[in-house]
């Protein structure tokens, strides 16, 4: 979940277990990506997948804060690509909400998504089992703020978002091909 100065992130394994999480300065993450891909003893390995939340057009004005977040998302993506180790995908907040909530326009989507994530990791024991306490931490112990958004991205990707992103890419390719066809036809 890239932000204008801080980025919330989670590292999950193939089964969705949270291995590490944090909210770090963008410059620190950029250095991590460029230097070693090691963060607090957790490592990204060749073949791992990184999914970044990316903004999509909303038909509203955009703030400087949002432009800064987009700029950092691009810088982080470029640094990750330069490693040649990981595959990078992007998913929009709208796509995450649609996958996890099942529809658009749900009131208080962030609170509902957090509740869905807690239920997913609760193993039948409710919020206390999912989050836990300092003495008895659950799988989501310590997850806070933008880390929840990053976890939502990871869970949505594991569920269905990859299919939605693929459909988006196919629609964009069809539009590009149609525009190219019209351009050639107009030039003839």
Question: Where is each model-derived feature located?
Answer:
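Phosphate- and other anionic-substrate recognition elements at nucleic-acid/protein interfaces
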Residues: 2-188
